[in-house]
Each structure stands twice: as C-alpha cells, then as structure tokens.
C-alpha cells in the first residue's frame, strides 16, 4: 500500500523567519515586476494582523484624523496624536516596512521643524516617513534622505491641500496637469524618494508615471 510519512517536525527545528522589508528591498520588488502590498493601521491589533498576513508596507496615515478620531479631514490631527498611533503600530509590526505620515503643519513652516519631526518619528519606531507635495518638496525630501531616513512622496489628490484643490477631486485630467504631475514624480524620484503615492489620478496617468519611474 501507499506509505504514509509520519515524521514529525522536532520542537527544536528552527522556523523560517520572514525577511524584513526595507525601502531598498521594495525597489527590488518593483524591478522583478512583483506586486507590493500595503495597508494603513492605527492600532496594535490591526498592525499585528497586517504583519502576520505578510503585508509589505504598513502606513500610519494621517487619515487617523477622519477615520478614527472623528475629524472632518486630515488637517486637524496633531503630531502627538500621530505618535500615539505610531507607537501602537510599532508594537505589532516586525516584518513590514513601517511608514509614518507627516501631519499638516509638521513640515510646512521650515526645514528645522520638519527634520525635528522626522527624528522624533524615527525614535518612536518609524522606518520611513511620507509627506505630500510635488516639486516644491524635492529639496526637503533630499535633506531628509541625506539624513538617513527613507521618504515616500505623495502627489495627485493630496488631502492636506483639500481646500486649495476645491475638494476631493480627481487630479491630472488635463494634458497640462498630467504633464505637471509627471514632472513632480520625476523630481521626487531624483530627490531620493523610495516610493510615491499616486492618489486620485486617471489610471492611464498612473500607469505612465509608474513606467517612467524606477521606484
């Protein structure tokens, strides 16, 4: 008859530890043409489940404001509120790359304020930071990267600029606006961003930008 393997795994057999996701390793994922998975988390249970599920990137987003704290937009959330969420998520994440959103006002006034916020984030467990804006943020991104902290950019529909945009509207629909967003993406890549969020833009433009960039 057919033999049955009754060999059991020894309790002393080491289990394979999933490889830690880093900003550079995500670059290799894109080069291979593989998909990158990402989720937002604001608390320990959500972070733990995302990490155990094999999610590559966990973002502590400023959407904490209007999805968990009851604010009408992302604008009112404070740095201290973001830190509470960041520390909780840090306790649940081991494998995934942990990225933290820089809230409105934490990088808009001057470079020192921005760098001080970044340093506090890293000391609290963030492995990368995300900030919104196009070419006008390129030099700040360059400074942060030069200080050893990976940066994720964010262009298109940028919620922190909701009032200037006239609401949550699709961006980049005209040829001129599409060209401007492509130029923004190229500048952010050149400045050292390891990834860019493309929010609220036509899928054809997103595809074009994705193909033009190496990140």
Residue ranges and their predicted role:
Residues 1-215:
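Alpha/beta enzyme core
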């Amino acid at each position: 008859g057919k033999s049955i393997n009754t060999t059991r795994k020894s309790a002393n057999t080491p289990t394979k530890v999933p490889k830690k996701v880093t900003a550079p390793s995500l670059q290799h994922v894109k080069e291979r043409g593989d998909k990158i998975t990402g989720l937002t988390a604001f608390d320990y249970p959500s972070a733990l489940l995302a990490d155990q599920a094999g999610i590559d990137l966990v973002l502590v987003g400023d959407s904490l404001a209007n999805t968990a704290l009851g604010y009408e937009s992302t604008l009112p959330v404070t740095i201290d509120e973001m830190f509470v969420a960041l520390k909780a998520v840090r306790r649940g994440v081991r494998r995934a790359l942990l990225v933290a959103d820089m809230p409105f006002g934490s990088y808009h006034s001057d470079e020192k304020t921005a760098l001080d916020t970044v340093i506090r984030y890293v000391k609290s467990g963030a492995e990368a930071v995300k900030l919104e804006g196009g070419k006008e943020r390129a030099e700040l991104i360059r400074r942060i990267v030069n200080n050893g902290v990976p940066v994720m950019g964010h262009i298109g529909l940028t919620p922190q600029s909701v009032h200037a945009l006239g609401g949550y509207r699709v961006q980049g629909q005209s040829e001129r606006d599409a060209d401007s967003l492509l130029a923004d993406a190229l500048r952010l890549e050149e400045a050292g961003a390891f990834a860019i969020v493309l929010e609220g833009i036509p899928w054809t433009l997103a595809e074009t930008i994705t193909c033009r960039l190496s990140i």
